[in-house]
Amino acid sequence: MIEKTYQPSDIESRMSRVWEEAGAFKAGRPERREAEPFTIVIPPPNVTGSLHMGHALNNTLQDVLCRFERMRGRDVLWQPGTDHAGIATQMVVERQLMERKEPGRREMGRARFLERVWQWKAESGGVIVNQLKRLGASCDWSRERFTMDEGLSRAVAKVFVELHRAGLIYKDKRLVNWDPKLLTAISDLEVKQVEVKGSLWHLRYPIEGKAFDPSDPSTYIVVATTRPETMLGDTAVAVHPENAKLEYLIGSNVVLPLAGRIIPIVGDDYADPEKGTGAVKITPAHDFNDFEVGRRHHLPQISVLDREGRLTLSENEDFLRGLPSGALMLAEEFDGMDRFAARKAIVARLEEFGFLDKIEPHTHMVPHGDRSNAVVEPYLTDQWYVDAKELARPAMAAVRSGETAFVPKNWEKTYFEWMENIQPWCISRQLWWGHQIPAWYGPDGKVFVAETEDEAIGHALGYYVEQGVITAEQGAGMARDPAKRDGFITRDEDVLDTWFSSALWPFSTLGWPDETPEVRRYYPTNVLVTGFDIIFFWVARMMMMGIHFMKEAPFSTVYIHALVRDEKGAKMSKSKGNVIDPLNLVDKYGADALRFTLAAMAVQGRDIKLSPQRVEGYRNFATKFWNACRFAEMNDCVVPARFDPTAATETLNRWIVHETARTACEVTEAIESSRFNDAASAIYRFVWNVYCDWYLELAKPVILGEDSPAKSETRAMVAWARDEILKLLHPFMPFITEELWAVTAERTRLLTLTEWPNKADQTRKRRTLIAAADPFIGSEPITDLLEPYFRDDAAEAEIGWVVDLVTAIRSVRAEMNIPPATLAPLVLAGASDESRARAQRWSDVIKRMSRLADISFADQAPAGAVQLLIRGEVAALPLKGIVDVAAQRTRLGKEIAKADADIARVDLKLADQNFIANAPGEIVEDEKEKREAAAARKAKFVEALERLKAAE
């Protein structure tokens, strides 16, 4: 029996247990071993994480696909798991140690600290997994993986070794994003750009061979910089080769202020003649652009900052090389200073000696570590790199050939732009938590890369015996006795970038490098659902690794969803205080309501503006359907054995079969096309409007009337249509549908394992064939594609006429503010015989639902009547004596004027180029939406006014 009140929390906990106990989501179920597989890998959330709205959207869409395909009989594997999240996890544990006043990481030592991290993971690392289960994620949780599981770690080591052997992993000295607080290189994704109100310092660099005179511009060249603290590492000044004012200086030298070093003036396109002074200082060791300029001109790289962001000069051989002896005292003065203190000290000295030309206020973007919030330094250091350019070629070819497609397609352009300009991928991190790089160093620094330490020792002993460093006898002894080789080779202390192991996720989770049955069955995967922000960091790298090691792209479709913003369109952030916690919404309105909201708003390519009111609205939708099911139960509506809905004789019942099949087609096609919003809209319209508002209302007189064949058929059809709704709604609202499925009849299987409406599948197959021949299939009416025995044009024409007539009359009553108690007459003008017969058959229903006094027929519409066009025929509402036409005309005129004012106000804003250029994108979009709403409002009032004119 259905409970009187819909209580989401009770249902959700109960249904979660039911699914888990039944193993409902396990891949490879016995009855599906011969079925076509369908695979999705979850974007593994950080083990430190908790559910945010992006997770909620991402996993809702994945779950819709998985439940849909599972009901279509496929062997679904939704592979779950979490990412070890190197920096984030290490920071969490270090913070915990600090809060508990325990020894820090370095005091503990690596081994003990890693034990502590694993302990933290065991105690606290499952939070987000449990939250995903609350959302209803139908993953095969028995296969949950962690990026540092033993099997995945073995895959990481094998990939590293094979890429190194192929020359695709190497060590190099390059600039990296360096976090001076965390003391590690970080990826671009871990860098946030912060707008800072700073200064632009214009510095005078004396031209070699001329006596420097601050008052004589011919004796110096002015360069502008936001980072005077790095100027001691300058190795050139660049001007554009076509800079008419400065090109004559190319080839000459300047004297670096304070240091006295002679550095060249080079010609390079990087210098913008229209920007600043037209001359730029080149510091290859402290700027990414300067690094490339330095490589083009073979400039030395002088790093003047250490790992902690302090000036390092006194013992810096690169800095001291070629430095005049008189500059050493200044070097000692700045040595060891924090970079920002050094900035002030250096500027003061520059001003003292006349090298400071001017200071201008300057607002610019400064990179910060997203976790430490420290200003990130471009830092020159030895790191491990992947030759991403080589791996990118086949990854681009896979998308160009159609092996992998992006949805929406415009994201392919973004993918190609990044891949075509891809840089070497820095994969080493100066952390302890993560996959330690499988490289060992011999006594002379020789590198040995191997999957295990034993293999590395074997390579090292063989090499040093061959080189004569040790004898064969010594080598054999060291091989036999671990004590003799202790400390002979030392492992690289760095760990791999978290994205390195994540790049292997589609196949490492299946047991690779072993040839497991899972690898053979579930790779490649079908769909990847992810956000646009990690196309480069994750999607592209999975493509590279998957194609290189598996010889196939890891997925056939990449669906890119948009951002979830607040109701005003602003990006959610803690600083703004506008973050919406999905779990709060789940607690208040239920997981089903949140899921349906996110799916209904997931328009391809458009960010979601989320408000709690929308979630509340869909909770009300769930409640309405719940109450409809209670009505069916209370009136003994059940599906008899061997019930055939296509054998119905009652027009109303034939109509609901037609509408159900039509909706099944729409929902199926929309989900297959990743148009989640269209699928949700179709099922919402059907449940709320067709089933609840029309079918049940029209069926009530029969159901509540005397026993008859019509009553029996109608009760059966009410239950049958309810069951079809449960199936179609299940991917979006799994909890309420599974509960109602269980309590409304004796079932042989869970709803989540029940067959999707089959006739919709048959329609889909036919539609696929048509689409192959007609690229404009999207414009074809969905009713043209219904299977013949699920299509009933006569029933649709009859009930559709009743629905259209009642809807139009209700609309006029609302527009004219006619009170519900006031009954109006209806005249069908020039009605066909069929329309006359329909009006008579449905007279009581039409009068009751439209609040009519009577229905009559005439050759023409009477004077003073509002005319409605219903399927090509005129229905007239004589309103004389019912409506004050003059007052309504005045009211509608005011509404139109108000809408015009709103449109004009928005148009004025949108015509302002300053507003368009400076306002945040979400504000501009909000204004455009306001205009659309005002225009729609105006159109409605204009239409009402036109109708009113006919009543005069």
UniProtKB/Swiss-Prot annotation:
<dbReference type="InterPro" id="IPR010978">
    <property type="entry name" value="tRNA-bd_arm"/>
</dbReference>
<dbReference type="GO" id="GO:0005524">
    <property type="term" value="F:ATP binding"/>
</dbReference>
<dbReference type="InterPro" id="IPR001412">
    <property type="entry name" value="aa-tRNA-synth_I_CS"/>
</dbReference>
<dbReference type="GO" id="GO:0006438">
    <property type="term" value="P:valyl-tRNA aminoacylation"/>
</dbReference>
<dbReference type="InterPro" id="IPR019499">
    <property type="entry name" value="Val-tRNA_synth_tRNA-bd"/>
</dbReference>
<dbReference type="InterPro" id="IPR009008">
    <property type="entry name" value="Val/Leu/Ile-tRNA-synth_edit"/>
</dbReference>
<dbReference type="InterPro" id="IPR002303">
    <property type="entry name" value="Valyl-tRNA_ligase"/>
</dbReference>
<keyword id="KW-0436">Ligase</keyword>
<keyword id="KW-0067">ATP-binding</keyword>
<dbReference type="Pfam" id="PF08264">
    <property type="entry name" value="Anticodon_1"/>
</dbReference>
<dbReference type="GO" id="GO:0005829">
    <property type="term" value="C:cytosol"/>
</dbReference>
<keyword id="KW-0963">Cytoplasm</keyword>
<keyword id="KW-0648">Protein biosynthesis</keyword>
<keyword id="KW-0175">Coiled coil</keyword>
<dbReference type="Pfam" id="PF10458">
    <property type="entry name" value="Val_tRNA-synt_C"/>
</dbReference>
<feature type="coiled-coil region">
    <location>
        <begin position="894"/>
        <end position="950"/>
    </location>
</feature>
<dbReference type="InterPro" id="IPR037118">
    <property type="entry name" value="Val-tRNA_synth_C_sf"/>
</dbReference>
<feature type="short sequence motif" description="'KMSKS' region">
    <location>
        <begin position="571"/>
        <end position="575"/>
    </location>
</feature>
<feature type="short sequence motif" description="'HIGH' region">
    <location>
        <begin position="45"/>
        <end position="55"/>
    </location>
</feature>
<feature type="binding site">
    <location>
        <position position="574"/>
    </location>
    <ligand>
        <name>ATP</name>
    </ligand>
</feature>
<dbReference type="Pfam" id="PF00133">
    <property type="entry name" value="tRNA-synt_1"/>
</dbReference>
<comment type="similarity">
    <text>Belongs to the class-I aminoacyl-tRNA synthetase family. ValS type 1 subfamily.</text>
</comment>
<keyword id="KW-0030">Aminoacyl-tRNA synthetase</keyword>
<comment type="subunit">
    <text>Monomer.</text>
</comment>
<dbReference type="InterPro" id="IPR013155">
    <property type="entry name" value="M/V/L/I-tRNA-synth_anticd-bd"/>
</dbReference>
<protein>
    <recommendedName>
        <fullName>Valine--tRNA ligase</fullName>
        <ecNumber>6.1.1.9</ecNumber>
    </recommendedName>
</protein>
<dbReference type="InterPro" id="IPR002300">
    <property type="entry name" value="aa-tRNA-synth_Ia"/>
</dbReference>
<dbReference type="InterPro" id="IPR033705">
    <property type="entry name" value="Anticodon_Ia_Val"/>
</dbReference>
<keyword id="KW-0547">Nucleotide-binding</keyword>
<dbReference type="InterPro" id="IPR009080">
    <property type="entry name" value="tRNAsynth_Ia_anticodon-bd"/>
</dbReference>
<dbReference type="GO" id="GO:0004832">
    <property type="term" value="F:valine-tRNA ligase activity"/>
</dbReference>
<dbReference type="GO" id="GO:0002161">
    <property type="term" value="F:aminoacyl-tRNA deacylase activity"/>
</dbReference>
<comment type="function">
    <text>Catalyzes the attachment of valine to tRNA(Val). As ValRS can inadvertently accommodate and process structurally similar amino acids such as threonine, to avoid such errors, it has a 'posttransfer' editing activity that hydrolyzes mischarged Thr-tRNA(Val) in a tRNA-dependent manner.</text>
</comment>
<dbReference type="InterPro" id="IPR014729">
    <property type="entry name" value="Rossmann-like_a/b/a_fold"/>
</dbReference>
